[in-house]
């Protein structure tokens, strides 16, 4: 055995479930295209949504003083290629074809476009193997995004693919018990919940993932969670997951600062159910990580 060359005599390869095969070094896996039936069904459902033009306008009111106009709705845009979830304060734009991917998150109150590049909707590690939840690959530059690039991008290999979506009203997720000293009267939250249904690649036939996005009325707040449905008849193990993977635009470019701790974070606040220690946000949230993007090579630091 020397370097990357080996001579094997009477070699025997053992494997589990999936038979190994020889492929080129750059092979990333088979890319499955969206079926015509699924494409027609999605186009028909998207065509029933109200159409908006992007970018959306900024609100003319201060939501902290008067937020009655901030109603969550689901729209279509870009000739039915995109689904837009917005309440007039924030918006999230999803490209649906050829696979689900968030292409923009906008703070409509400030006019900020929060994303500089397209990624995926998360990563599941099932039985030791990583699978992308939706996502588009092939972006030529990761410092910014042009909409014309999206039409040439392709799904990630071995990724979960969108096959359906539904829109519903937000329902209470916990039974909150109001106290006598609480000034706020108990009321149910209102808004829209957008749920995408994704199916696994061929090796995970029967495994589906529901991605839920809830946008509240009157609040610049989006909630996200997922469910896994296993109808394969066999056990699968969820080793780990990444619920959100966003290529955020940096709020500043300090060429002198070389330590990541010196960089300003994007203008976004992230919360999860996993809060620990003294519940001070910057140290309590152990699920939020700001990491370098190896794809982003056009920035000096």
Predicted regions located by residue number:
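Gly-Asp-aromatic-enriched flexible segments
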Residues: 1-49
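N-terminal accessory beta-strand-rich subdomains and adjacent acidic, glycine-rich linkers
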Residues: 49-301
